[in-house]
Amino acid sequence: MKNIILLVMIALVPFSCFSQETPKKDKEHHEMKPSKNEDGEWDLTVIDTQFDYFLNAVAKPISQYSESYLKTKNTFLVNEWNSYYNSGRYRNIIESGIDYDPKENYGIKFEYKLYQVFVYVNWKYKLRLNGLSGSDAIR
């Protein structure tokens, strides 16, 4: 009986060495997608704790921008951002692409917050984005 148990245990040892996880793909595509909040308005969640400080203390107020201006800038900046993401450039800063539809009416609050994300990345990481206005870009 001891020999049978020993034989079964020896037979099972190789199976315990196999990985239980499925291997990840070389390049996973993560995208930030806008979502609607409880009020039905588009909202953007930024997880960086310094972003709220930046928005309240450093960023220009929302009254300085028009919605059409922000939409135009965001369209260009999202394309530039996604180009960097897809090429693997600035991988330590840009960890996901952005799913943004310029035909969608997101509202000025969303457009403002998205634009300020680009200004914030420029401010914090000194990442040069060509679509930023001269007064918003850190040189």
What do these predicted ranges mean?
Residues 23-139:
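Short beta-strand and adjacent turn/loop elements
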Residues 1-23:
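Bacterial Sec-dependent N-terminal signal peptides
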